Amino acid sequence: MDKETFAEFAVKSTIETTLQEALDIIDADDGKSWEEKRAALIQHLQSHKEPVLVDALADLAVADTMGQQNRNKFWSYGEIFCPDSNLLLRDVVEADRESYMAMQKEYSIMKSMLNEEAYCTMVWNEHLDPKALMLTIEKAGTYVGYCGIKRTVEKPWEIAIELLPQWTNHGIGSVAIPAMMSAIRDRLGESEFRVRIDPGNLASQKLFDKLGAVPNGISEFLIHDQDALEQCEAEHLDQIDDHLIAISNKFNVEPRKLLSHVLEYKLVCR
């Protein structure tokens, strides 16, 4: 198994099943209004044993006032331009959708679901979620990816970043992330952030090490069922190598735990 899929393996099957059930409810030609479908969806999800997944899917249909206020206040100060690198950080617009979805087809653990238009719409709407603060990254007018905060209603704020494959290894993250954090600190008063990275994603680990992030333990990735996590670990013990052992020492955890968990970093904007 590719090391970048350690944590992903533990969640893929459960997510696929639950999302398909959700899409069946939404797409049903039963004459019900969206509000009735939403109520049915939430009722169905409440019976699911993964509370984090339940919250994530149910929240897609819920506008959060506090998150929208954070977003409005942030953008009231305008866009962020980084002249030395010719990068622009701006609000997400509908015209970004095609490039954003192309990026999801490269990186998503749910690639098969991206053939479903309803799922694509769900993914795009999540990117626009009022509880998130997402910044499109442009270089010389060209879409290269995004960075942002996944949920501004939960602290510490968790940083997210994805770049189109052709724009990785160009130093964009090392410029965009500090620029975003400085703007958030100055505009919204938040200076402490959370970063979660798959143990196999060496590029992201190097980026955030360079930015001054410090190890802060490990965390589960969507799936919290202990039996499923332990099964994933037991089935892939042969994937433990010197690299994984070195990371486990750095984060002070058992190597096998990195087969089912992601790395936690703490990053403070000074």
What do these predicted regions represent?
Residues Q104, S108-E117:
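A short gly/proline-enriched turn/hairpin at secondary-structure junctions
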Residues I109-M110, C120, V153-K155:
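A short local loop/turn or secondary-structure capping micro-motif enriched for an aromatic residue
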Residues K37-L41:
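Amphipathic, non-membrane alpha-helical rod segments
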Residues D24-E36, S47-V54:
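Charged, low-complexity interaction regions
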Residues L114-L135:
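Active-site rim helix/loop that mediates acceptor-substrate recognition in acyltransferases
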Residues D2-E8, Q43-E98, K105, E138-R270:
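Acyl-donor (CoA/ACP) binding surface of acyl/acetyltransferases
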